Curated annotation (Swiss-Prot):
This is Glycerol-3-phosphate dehydrogenase [NAD(P)+]. Pathway: Membrane lipid metabolism; glycerophospholipid metabolism. It catalyses: sn-glycerol 3-phosphate + NAD(+) = dihydroxyacetone phosphate + NADH + H(+); sn-glycerol 3-phosphate + NADP(+) = dihydroxyacetone phosphate + NADPH + H(+). Catalyzes the reduction of the glycolytic intermediate dihydroxyacetone phosphate (DHAP) to sn-glycerol 3-phosphate (G3P), the key precursor for phospholipid synthesis. GO terms for molecular function: glycerol-3-phosphate dehydrogenase [NAD(P)+] activity; NAD binding. Keywords: Cytoplasm, Lipid biosynthesis, Lipid metabolism, NAD, NADP, Nucleotide-binding, Oxidoreductase, Phospholipid biosynthesis, Phospholipid metabolism. It is found in: Cytoplasm. Pfam families: NAD_Gly3P_dh_C, NAD_Gly3P_dh_N. GO terms for biological process: carbohydrate metabolic process; glycerol-3-phosphate biosynthetic process; glycerol-3-phosphate catabolic process; glycerophospholipid metabolic process; phospholipid biosynthetic process. It is an enzyme of class 1 (oxidoreductase). InterPro entries: 6-PGluconate_DH-like_C_sf, 6PGD_dom2, G3P_DH_NAD-dep, G3P_DH_NAD-dep_C, G3P_DH_NAD-dep_N, NAD(P)-bd_dom_sf. The keyword Lipid biosynthesis applies. Its main location: cytoplasm.
Length: 344
C-alpha cells in the first residue's frame, strides 16, 4: 500500500480520500484552514462539506510540508481559482518522483489554460507525466460506496495506470486514456451545459428541453474540443457524455442547482451567495466563450448562457433565440468531426 496526499478537503477531495483509505492506503487530507483539519481529526467527519464517517486511515493536515513529505502520489482537488497558489506551495516540498494527479474540472478564464497546463507552469514537472481523474462521480455517492466509474488520463500511460491502481475498488472502477486534452475539456465544459439544464428546469420546461440541451451541448463540446486537438471519441466516454448526463440530471450537481435558481429569476450574485460553494461552470463559461471566438467555433448554447450570466439577458429570450436559429442538418457536426479525425 502507498502513502497518498489529497490536497483539498471539500466534498470531492474527502470522497476521493475515502476511496483511497478503503483501498488500504495511508491518506493525508490537506485543508488550507487549520481549524478545519483539527475538526476532521477530532470528529472523523467533515461536517461543512461531506458529512459522512471518515476512516481512521485518513489524517487531516493544514501544513503542506507535513502533508506531502514522503508520499508516493499527490491528488490535487482544489477549485480552479486556487490551483496556481496551491501548486506553487506544493512544488516547494514535493519529491520529483511523486505521481501528480488532479481531479479539478475547470478552465482558467483569462489565460484559457486547462488545469494540467496550470500545474505544469507552477511546478517542476513534465506535462506528459500529469494525470487527470474525471468522470460522472458525485462526491455524495462515491462516499457512500455507490458504484462509480471514472477515467484517469495522461500522455504517460504508466502514470495513468498508477492512478488507476491507487483508486480501483469494488465500488470505484477506473479506466485509462492517453487523451488528457479531451478528458479535461469534457469534464470542464459539461458544467456549462449543466447550468443550462438547471435554467431549463427553473423555467419549468420538461424532459424534451433537457434532452435537447444535453445532446446539442455535447455537439458543442465536441466541436470545440476537436478544434483544439482532442480525440472526438473521448467525448462519447465517461468524462464526456457520462459526466454530462449525471451533471445535467441530478440535484447533487452544483451547476444544475445554480442554473435552476437562475431560471427561477434569481440574480447571479445572489445565487453564488446562496450556494456557498464553488460553481465551476460560472468561471468556465467565460473561458469557453472566448475559446469559441478564438477558434471560430459555433457554440450557441454556451453563448446563450454567457448572455444570461454576464449580460443580464432574460433566460426566456435566450431560449427563443436558440429555437429560432437557422435550419441545418443534425449530422453536420458528426460528419465534420470524423472527417477531420480520420481523413488522410
Amino acid at each position: 500500500m502507498e502513502k497518498v496526499a489529497v490536497l483539498g478537503a471539500g466534498s470531492w477531495g474527502t470522497a476521493l480520500a475515502i476511496v483511497l483509505a478503503d483501498n488500504g492506503h495511508e491518506v493525508r487530507l490537506w485543508s488550507h484552514r487549520k481549524e478545519h483539519a483539527e475538526t476532521i481529526n477530532e470528529t472523523h467527519r467533515n461536517h461543512k462539506y461531506l458529512d459522512v464517517d471518515i476512516p481512521n486511515e485518513i489524517t487531516a493536515y493544514s501544513d503542506m510540508h507535513q502533508t506531502v513529505s514522503g508520499v508516493d502520489a499527490v491528488v490535487i482537488v482544489v477549485p480552479t481559482k486556487a490551483i496556481r497558489e496551491v501548486c506553487s506551495e506544493l512544488n516547494k516540498w514535493m519529491d520529483s518522483k511523486t505521481t501528480v494527479i488532479h481531479a479539478t474540472k475547470g478552465i482558467e478564464p483569462v489565460s484559457l489554460k486547462r488545469v494540467s497546463e496550470m500545474i505544469e507552469e507552477e511546478m517542476d514537472i513534465k506535462y506528459e507525466d500529469i494525470v487527470v481523474l474525471s468522470g460522472p462521480s458525485h462526491a455524495e455517492e462515491v462516499a457512500l460506496r455507490h458504484p462509480t466509474t471514472v477515467t484517469t488520463s495522461s500522455i504517460n500511460l504508466e502514470k495513468a495506470k498508477h492512478a488507476q491502481d491507487l483508486f480501483s475498488s469494488d465500488s470505484f472502477r477506473v479506466y485509462t486514456s492517453d487523451d488528457i486534452l479531451g478528458i479535461e475539456l469534457g469534464g470542464a465544459l459539461k458544467n456549462i451545459i449543466a447550468l443550462g439544464a438547471g435554467i431549463s428546469d427553473g423555467l419549468g420546461f420538461g424532459d424534451n428541453a433537457k434532452a435537447a440541451l444535453i445532446t446539442r451541448g455535447l455537439a458543442e463540446i465536441a466541436r470545440l474540443g476537436t478544434s483544439l486537438g482532442a480525440n472526438p471519441l473521448s467525448f462519447l466516454g465517461l468524462s464526456g457524455v457520462g459526466d454530462l448526463i449525471v451533471t445535467c440530471t441530478s440535484v447533487h450537481s452544483r451547476n444544475w442547482r445554480a442554473g435552476n435558481l437562475l431560471g427561477k429569476g434569481n440574480q447571479l450574485e445572489d445565487v453564488l451567495e446562496q450556494m456557498g460553494m464553488v460553481v465551476e461552470g460560472v468561471r468556465t463559461v467565460k473561458a469557453a466563450h472566448q475559446f469559441a471566438k478564438d477558434q471560430n467555433v459555433d457554440m450557441p448554447i454556451t453563448s446563450g448562457i454567457f448572455q444570461i450570466l454576464f449580460e443580464n439577458k432574460n433566460p426566456k429570450d435566450v431560449v427563443e433565440q436558440l429555437m429560432n436559429r437557422g435550419k441545418r442538418d443534425e449530422m453536420d457536426d458528426l460528419a465534420v468531426l470524423l472527417k477531420e479525425r480520420y481523413s488522410e
